[in-house]
Amino acid sequence: MTIPATRKDLMIVNMGPHHPSMHGVLRLILTLDGEDVIDCEPVLGYLHRGMEKIAENRTIIQYLPYVTRWDYLATMFTEVITVNAPEQLGNIQVPKRAGYIRTIMLELSRIASHLLWLGPFMADIGAQTPFFYIFRERELIYDLFEAATGMRMMHNYFRIGGVAADLPHGWIDKCLDFCNYFLTGLAEYEKLITRNPIFLERVEGIGIIGKEEAISWGLSGPMLRASGMQWDLRKIDNSECYKKFDWEVQWQKEGDSLARYLVRIGEMRESIKMIQQALEGIPGGPYENLEIRCFDRERYPEWGGFEYRFISKKPSPTFELPKQELYVRVEAPKGELGVFLIGDRSSFPWRWKIRPPGFMNLQILPQLVKRMKLADIMTILGSIDIIMGEVDR
């Protein structure tokens, strides 16, 4: 039997969930015509842990260690959104020093997240050298985190009304030294990557998203700013101390994978500027609002007895969440990270809805990869920058 020459046999291929370019347990069901992508269906849920339901049976302080497992490469942002929600709901003031410390930690976390995006992204498209270079600078950031918080990852550092501990002696000088050093490292990255003809061949004009299209899909962060939209929640919401610093929103108008790379490189430079300004202008004073410790604290008379003399009794501060609804958001490295909180006059949230930026940005992937080559999937997916911990929650 002869097969007509015009007939095309389509091939269905599973990419992931254990593929190294999937950045986690993401599975793509691809329909291919040779090397051309006809259709793409993402399959999610392999890392679902019920983070929203867990919050309904915990106080905010008890829930804080869980939130660092959403986006485990930018844990400071998941922590700050978790404490911002009850702070706004209960009208709790944050001391100025704590606000500056939070801003410094957030921007260091943004740089660390962008570095760990840059290395694997370059490895996905065939450049192995930057993958090893980024760990050199990232290690220095984690050393700073370890000195201030005691943990390299999953810091559990933010508290309602401030932070867990003040900056140790000499930490500010070490951080300033890192900022000066990192600017030279960033120039090295740009010299190595930005004008490389092979790199430009792989990313220029790949995965183009228009401005109106980005808004319609609900994209945020570098995905939105690379499409010509100057939208940064740090400028719009004036969260923490960002309005006190001199910095510029990084954006591009081309909307392709190269534009998303340039936005993130520019953001790292702006983050260094903000950290330097914060370190030079950090005020004195308390690092936490001590009044929050008085909320519903239980004390027992026997705790003052001899048997309890050497045992530290610091019960977790809890307070009644008023019967209100509240949406809080922060500009995370991957986009707008938000939490919708509903209180019902108890210590536990009645509803805790997470708005992860990676989940929203991933929706446009099937549209971007259609009619592209199979090898371009790694470029496009890498430029989106997803972490499956926050996508699946």
UniProtKB/Swiss-Prot annotation:
Keyword terms of this UniProt record: Chloroplast, Membrane, NAD, NADP, Plastid, Plastoquinone, Quinone, Thylakoid, Translocase, Transport
Reactions the enzyme catalyzes: a plastoquinone + NADH + (n+1) H(+)(in) = a plastoquinol + NAD(+) + n H(+)(out); a plastoquinone + NADPH + (n+1) H(+)(in) = a plastoquinol + NADP(+) + n H(+)(out)
UniProt key word Ubl conjugation: no
GO biological process: photosynthesis, light reaction
EC number(s) given by UniProt: 7.1.1.-
A single GO molecular function term of this UniProt record: oxidoreductase activity, acting on NAD(P)H, quinone or similar compound as acceptor
InterPro entries: NADH_Q_OxRdtase_suD, NADH_UbQ_OxRdtase_49kDa_CS, NDH1_su_D/H, NiFe-Hase_large
Pfam families on file: Complex1_49kDa (PF00346)
Subcellular location per the Swiss-Prot or TrEMBL entry: Plastid, Chloroplast thylakoid membrane
Lipid bilayer topology: Peripheral membrane protein
SUPFAM superfamilies in the cross-refs: HydB/Nqo4-like
Group of enzyme by EC: translocase
GO cellular component, one term: chloroplast thylakoid membrane
Main location per the UniProt record: plastid
Coiled coil spans: none
Subunit structure: NDH is composed of at least 16 different subunits, 5 of which are encoded in the nucleus.
HAMAP family attached to this UniProt entry: NDH1_NuoD
Role, per record: NDH shuttles electrons from NAD(P)H:plastoquinone, via FMN and iron-sulfur (Fe-S) centers, to quinones in the photosynthetic chain and possibly in a chloroplast respiratory chain. The immediate electron acceptor for the enzyme in this species is believed to be plastoquinone. Couples the redox reaction to proton translocation, and thus conserves the redox energy in a proton gradient.
The family this protein is said to belong to: Belongs to the complex I 49 kDa subunit family.
Entry-linked PANTHER family: NADH DEHYDROGENASE [UBIQUINONE] IRON-SULFUR PROTEIN 2, MITOCHONDRIAL (PTHR11993:SF10), NADH-UBIQUINONE OXIDOREDUCTASE 49 KDA SUBUNIT (PTHR11993)
Annotated protein name in UniProt: NAD(P)H-quinone oxidoreductase subunit H, chloroplastic
Species: Pelargonium hortorum
